[in-house]
Structure formats: C-alpha cells, structure tokens
A protein has these predicted regions:
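Extended intrinsically disordered, low-complexity coil regions enriched in Ser, Thr, Gly, Ala
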Residues: 53-60, 72-82, 115-122, 151-152, ...
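Primary recognition of N-terminal secretory signal peptides and signal-anchoring hydrophobic helices
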Residues: 12, 17, 25-125
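Exposed beta-strand-loop-beta-strand "reactive/processing" segments of non-cytosolic proteins
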Residues: 151-203, 249-303, 359, 491
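N-terminal, post-signal-peptide region of Sec/Tat-exported proteins
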Residues: 49-84, 148-185
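Short, non-transmembrane alpha-helical segments in secretory-pathway proteins
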Residues: 128-173, 221-265
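N-terminal secretory signal peptides that target proteins for export/translocation
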Residues: 1-9
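Extended effector regions of multi-domain proteins
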Residues: 139, 202-220, 243-245, 283-373, ...
Length: 768
C-alpha cells in the first residue's frame, strides 16, 4: 500500500510539472513554431469540428486521434507523433494548458494530409453497382414528386439502385469494358394495404414504371413506431387496462410495433387491414425498459385509422420492477492495459470507391436498406488472372420465431429484414469495442422513409487481423521449419432490430476461404412471470417455454435462423451442384484389410432435389465442370452451412409441420437450396412477407423445378441457432456466433498461400 501511495504521489508530481511546463509554453494559447508564435486551439473542439475522435489514455498519458483509417498518437510536449505507427514531426507540439490539451491551428491539415494514409484511392471509373448517392436519391424523389403519380405524404419502403444486367457488370469488372447503361432507381411506396413499385431513369429523371399492388402489406417503417406510441397514449381503453396493472402514467409506457403474422383467420384479424400488434414495457428509469414487460396485454392497432381496434388480455402479472441497468454502474470501470494494434507501414488493403483490394481478393461493398451489407464482383487473382468466385452475396433474410403459445407471444416470428429492413436499422460501429481501433470505418447513404438521403456514419468496418498459423511443419531430424501466419480481412456490419443487435462478418482468408459469421447480442425478449425462483410453486408452469433468468423474468426459447443468398460464379457462370460421400467399401485387393474408404459422387440435377437438410458427413460442392486445375480436377467451392458456433445449432424449424409459419417460410427448415439464377428472386421469405398467406420465397422459386446442371446458379444457405436462455445472458447478452464457410475445393493447383507475393504485388496496382 505504501509503495502504491508513493507511486501515486510521484505520478501527481510529474503531472504537475508537465502542467506547469505546458502552461508556460501555452501562455496566451500560443506556442513557438519555427522561431515565431503559433496560434493554439482546443484539441477536442478542433478535432470534433473536423470529424475526428479523440480519446485519452491516462495510463500512458497519450492522446489517440482517429478519423477514417488514420490513427494518430500524441504525447504532451512532444513534437513527435505516430501516424498509423509511423513517426511524424509536428511544427508545434501538443500542449496542456489549464489541464486541457491544445494544438497548433494547422495540426489537422499537417497530420491528416501527411500522405501517410494510402488506404483510399481515386475511382477512375464508376462501378455499376455503386449505391445511389445523396444527389441521386434527391433526384429520384424529385422526379416522383413532380410526376403525375405524386401524392401527399409518400412513404418509401425502399429507394435504391435497380440491379444492372449481370453480364454487363462482369464485363466491366473482368474485361474492363465500358459500362454505358443508364442508372435506374427502383422504389417501393406504401399506401394503406397497397404497395407501389416504380422506377426512375436517372438520366432523363422520368418515372418509367408505376405498378400498384393491391392487398399487399409492406415493411414496418419508422413513422409506425411513432404512430403506435401516439395511439396508446391517447387510448382511454388502453389506459384503463394499464390501471388494472397498477400503471397510471402512460408516458412511461414504451410501445413496440410488432407484425401480426398469419394464422388462417384463427386469430380473428382481418387480412385486409393494415395493422400491427403492440406489446409494451415500463420505463422505470434504469435505462432498460426491456426488463419491465407489461405481460398479457396486447393492443391491435389499425395504422390507417391510428386507433386501437382490439385489446387482447390475459391474467394480470405484476410488472418486474427491480432495476436491471445494462450500462456499467461502477464509478470507475475495470481498466485493462491498452492493447494496441499498429500498422506502421499502413494498411494491406486499399479502397477505391466502394471496391476493396486486399492481397489477391477484390470485391465491391454496399449497404442495402433491406438486407444490409452486400458484397459483389468477388474475385481472386491467381497467377496474374482475376478469377470469378461470387457475383453477389448478402443476407437473404432471417426469421426469429418464438415457441410460447401465450397471448403475448404466439404471433412472434419476426422476419427482421423482410418486415423491418435491417439495412435501415444499421447501427454505427464504435471503434475499439464494436471493431478494432485499426478498422477503417465507412459511412453509407440510404434513403429514409420520406425518400430523402440518410447518411449512416461508421456503417461498415473493414480490418485485417491475425488468425493463427496458416500452416506449420517441423522436421524432427533437421532444422527445417515451415510456418506461415494466417491473415484475415473482416468486413463487419451491425443492425439493431428492437431488443437484439446482430453482427455480420464476412471473413476473407488468403487461402481462398470465405467465412460468413452471424452474431446475436443485445437484450433478450423476456416474459414477466410470478415466480422468483425455481423453488416457487408456479415455477414449473412459468418455465414451460423458457428459462427463469431473473426474479419474475423468463427468457423464452426461440430461434435465430439466417439465410444467405450467394450468387456463386465459380470460375465462371455455369456451375453444377454435386455431392461427395466418403463411404466404407469392401477391400477387393487382398491383404489384411477387409475394408476401404472410397468416395461416391453424384450430380444433383434439379432444384427440388437440391433442397436438403445439412448432413456434415456429405461434402457439397458447387462445381464448374468446364474448368479444371492442373491435375484435371474440376474446380469447385465447398458449401458448409454450419461450421461451428456458440449456441446449439438449429437443425431446422422447431415447429410441427401444420404450423402456418411452415406454410409461409420453407427456407427455415432446410439448410441448402440451389436455384437457377433469376434477378427477381432475391429474398428467401418472398418480396412481401408481412402477413403473407403462403410461401412466396424459396418454396415458390423451386416450384417449377428447373434444371441446375451446368447453369448460372444461386446458392441459399440457411444456418442458425436454437436459443435456450441462461442467466449469464441477462441483463445483456454476450455475443453468440454461428459460422458458415465456403471453401475452395480443387479450385487451385496447390496450397494457395505458397503463391502469395507476386500476385498480391500486382493486385496493389489493379484498382479497376
């Protein structure tokens, strides 16, 4: 203790001396630079104005300043700073005056225009898949607003780039052919129980398509959140239901707008009405209203009339009132010593427009308002040749079905992307916690529900990481060691849908493997119950459909089922789907062995036979029989829907076959689907999934049972977890991951990481 006090006293003396020195040099907010006085300004204020973030590390007395891919570390009274780990000399040092850091007024220009950041390159030609920019979104809205179709209060479920012709995009990207087609904006408007699909030619700024779809329910939009809150706050009937539960201040009630599903009319709801159900929570001031559910009270809200048309009630359950904040309530949080990632020579990747180059990989990234992060024109440069791997890859759709039949739960089967728009709900990524400090954070522009551009800061993170040894071999007799470190490039996107936060990582390895990882975190949707412990007489019934994770709170058992749409083009567009099964066969060659291991292979020829459960013992390949490696093997990529995770795997939907959910969403029960490419088939749950009465997605896509042999194919991989709640996930849930892989299979001639170097060097100069 004495030693610690002594160290603390020494630290105070040093800090005082530094402050005195800084005050001397910072007199009248000026310091000397090149023999003259320099004007000094506040570090925090100036950097904030420039869009940079400042964090002080008290342990090392260092200021870390970040903007984009630039990381600057500066110590008080030193004219030497580190920019991305590389030394740089300032004309004026950072000083401390009256306990506050100050810098020369030219600090930002001096540091951030130092030329040490080579991450971003100028895009010489515009990639055809580049997202609509702010100006194009405004032009689209203006074209609609000035057309004969315009009406007041237009509400947009979607406004984005119409997919250009695939063959022309590949020609641009692979063959460097000029792309001259006009850019077209497509949009979806919602008007009552109608959806309006349209297009605008951005060259002519004319509406070229206007198609009204009747009896069609679209997504839940942001103004719906506001509308249901207004409705419950003005409903006397709802307030009376609250009073029965001891709640007198409706302003403390938080409404959540939930889609109602479809149950063949058995729920008594009119299919034609534009409605949502409202389940509410009580704000008790602890910052976590999710911990205070108002159980067994559901309001059915007519969105067009903005009124409650029905209140569904069950037995009164007291609202759990114990404070359960999920923000740290410690006065001083546990402080770990800094873990610093430096890249002293800059990034190993570069970004040209929306195209990322890393080693032999090249790919385009965008943010879609519905499905979020979208990768396209994914290629791998092998021996100087840019080889196609995937035209487009993204989350196709997902569903979160709950297994509780009670009044406030039976309808909960959220189609997060199809009903709420996960791209619209993108969560800005925080450096140092959501992604490493060395990550490059990219903003994205999408259209909001009013048809206006919305900038989402830090929407996508891109970073490189060490991922263990790529390979290792040591010769026992001799001094030879073969060892190579594995590097991965991670592209991360996060979406917050109500209580849950979903993280999606696309992970590229130098050896050609692509991982797609989905992580669930945030706060569990919980049910209020009477039981405090499992020893209570009510506990058995209260936990019939979940786990008691706190006093009076049950985490209800549910699933997170993800489907990824992968438009694979393995070394070209014409691919086939095949199985390879390792089998035991009798030894017919003689000798002491009675059995052998051999491989049975077969090609799956149609879409319906390709829809199947995942058996990890079967090797599933997307194969290009028109291309071979040097040994004569056809080139392939292996498809692995479940490659590990931290929650129990969802082998399929945990529902009986007579459930309406099964009739509407076939995709959730099988893990592999392969269809012929069709640009209009984009969502496994169907384009308009809200209140759908039957499967308008993958179940419909394979209805014509097209041939899939040597065709342009799309793979739909379903994966997910069955979430059985546990106390360690409350009040906030550690991120739980499920992993998928697509993996080269005889795609290369040998170990691809032995061929690094020349190809990677050439790739650095290829910014098309």
């Amino acid at each position: 203790m004495r030693k610690q006090r002594l160290l603390n006293d020494i630290q105070k003396i040093l800090t005082l001396n530094l402050s005195i020195a800084a005050s001397f040099w910072g007199l009248n907010t000026q310091a000397f630079a090149h023999g003259g006085k320099a004007e000094m300004v506040s570090l925090y204020q100036n950097m904030s104005e420039q869009g940079a973030k400042v964090v002080k590390d008290d342990f090392t007395n260092t200021y870390m300043i970040t903007k984009g891919s630039m990381v600057v570390r500066a110590k008080p009274n030193s004219d030497q700073v580190l920019i991305n780990g590389k030394p740089f000399k300032l004309s004026v040092p950072l000083l401390v005056k009256d306990g506050k850091p100050v810098i020369g007024k030219d600090f930002f220009n001096e540091v951030f225009q130092s030329g040490l950041d080579q991450t971003f390159k100028i895009e010489n030609t515009f990639h055809p898949l580049n997202s609509l920019n702010s100006d194009e979104i405004k032009k689209t809205f203006d074209a609609i607003n000035h057309s004969k179709y315009a009406y007041k209060n237009m509400r947009f479920a979607e406004l984005k780039l119409k997919e250009p012709e695939k063959a022309k995009v590949w020609d641009y990207f692979i063959n460097h052919k000029e792309y001259t087609d006009a850019r077209i904006a497509s949009f979806i408007l919602l008007k009552g129980n109608q959806a309006i699909e349209g297009e605008v030619n951005l060259n002519t700024q004319q509406v070229t398509k206007w198609n009204v779809l009747k009896n069609t329910h679209g997504m839940v939009l942001l103004d719906n959140f506001e509308a249901v809150q207004r409705v419950i706050e003005t409903s006397k009937e709802y307030q009376e239901a609250l009073r029965k539960r001891g709640i007198t201040d409706v302003k403390k009630v938080i409404a959540t707008p939930l889609t109602v599903g479809y149950f063949g009319g058995k729920d008594g709801l009119d299919k034609q009405l534009n409605i949502l159900k409202v389940v509410a929570y009580l704000d008790v001031g602890d910052g976590n209203y999710w911990a205070h559910p108002i159980e067994n009270l559901v309001a059915v809200v007519d969105l067009d009339k903005e009124k409650i048309i029905k209140i569904e009630e069950g037995a009164i359950i007291p609202v759990p009132m114990a404070n359960r904040p999920y923000m740290s309530n410690k006065p001083v949080p546990n402080k770990l010593k800094p873990l610093t990632i430096t890249e002293p020579e800059g990034k190993n990747f570069s970004i040209t427009g929306q195209t990322i180059h890393w080693g032999n990989w090249c790919l385009h990234v965008a943010l879609d308002s519905r499905v979020g992060l979208q990768l396209s024109t994914v290629t791998y440069k092998d021996k100087g040749v840019k080889r196609k791997v995937m035209y487009e890859g993204n989350l196709g759709g997902m569903v979160v079905p709950y297994g509780d039949p009670d009044i406030g739960w039976y309808f909960k089967s959220y189609l997060d992307s199809g009903e709420y728009g996960m791209g619209t709900l993108t969560s800005s990524i925080l450096p140092g916690t959501d992604a490493p400090e060395n990550a490059v954070l990219l903003d994205a522009v999408i259209a909001d529900y009013k048809g206006q551009p919305q900038v989402i800061p830090n929407a996508i993170a891109v970073f490189e990481r060490y991922a263990g040894p790529e390979y290792k071999h040591h010769e026992i007799f001799g001094n030879q060691d073969a060892s190579e470190a594995r590097r991965e490039l991670v592209i991360r996107w996060i979406s917050t849908v109500g209580n849950y936060d979903y993280m999606f990582d696309w992970v590229f390895a130098q050896n050609g493997v692509i991982g797609i990882n989905a992580g669930a975190t945030g706060i569990e949707a919980v049910k209020g119950v009477k039981s405090r412990t499992m020893h209570d007489s009510t506990a058995k019934e209260d936990t019939k459909y979940g786990t008691l994770i706190d006093h009076n709170i049950v985490g209800t058992t549910h699933q997170h089922i993800y489907n990824f749409r992968l438009d694979m083009d393995v070394d070209g567009e014409n691919n086939s789907f095949m199985h390879m099964d390792p089998v035991v066969k009798a030894n017919d060659k003689g000798g002491v062995r009675t059995s052998t291991m051999q491989i049975d292979s077969k090609v799956i020829t149609n879409e319906q036979n390709a829809a199947e459960k995942f058996d990890p013992s079967t090797i599933r390949l997307l194969t290009n029989f028109n291309k071979e490696n040097k040994l004569g093997n056809p080139v392939s990529y292996q498809l692995i829907p479940f490659a590990g995770g931290t929650h129990p795997v969802a082998k399929g939907a945990n529902f009986s076959k007579d459930e309406w959910l099964f009739k509407r969403l076939n995709f959730m029960d099988k893990q592999i689907w392969v269809t012929q490419y069709n640009p209009d088939e984009r969502y496994p749950e169907g384009k308009y999934s809200n209140r759908s009465t039957h499967d308008t997605g993958l179940g419909q896509f394979i209805g014509n049972n097209e041939n899939i042999e040597n065709k342009d194919l799309v793979v739909w991989m379903t994966t997910g977890t069955t979430h059985v709640a546990r106390a360690e996930e409350w009040p906030i849930m550690p991120t739980e991951w499920v992993n998928t892989l697509i993996k080269p299979w005889n795609f290369f001639d040998n170990t691809p990481t032995l061929n690094l170097g020349e190809d990677e060097q050439n790739t650095q100069h290829d910014h098309h």
